[in-house]
Amino acid sequence: NLVAKTSIRKRREAALKEAEAHKGPSIVICYAPCINHGIKKGMGCVQQEMKDAVASGYWNLYRYSPETHKFTLDSKEPSMALYDFMKGEVRYSSLELSFPENAKVLFAEAEDAAKAKYESYKRRAEDQ
């Protein structure tokens, strides 16, 4: 199975072309913000929200081809704090309002997990 993780905004063309050309099933997971995310800037800023999701490490972009056993990491190293991305969405910021101490711990854990995930993907791409 060909697998790719992309967003509506970034690198989707390459992922979809590879998926279409692959002989067999393909899975393309695409980040697409919706109104239920509670984007504080409003739905008119969805393009920026997708960019921030990638820049913060919340959503890493990659492609994997089973035919070549090649894993391609399309994301660059995160350039913004995950917390800065998460506080821009009501689905996350509401936790901070309701349970500030828990939120602080959970946001720190999420930041650590996002960094570890990116490093894991980076190592995998470099080991090719």
Regions found by a protein language model. Name each.
Residues L2-A4, I29-C30:
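General beta-strand structural signal in soluble alpha/beta enzymes
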Residues K5-E13:
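Active-site glycine- and acidic-residue-rich loops that bind
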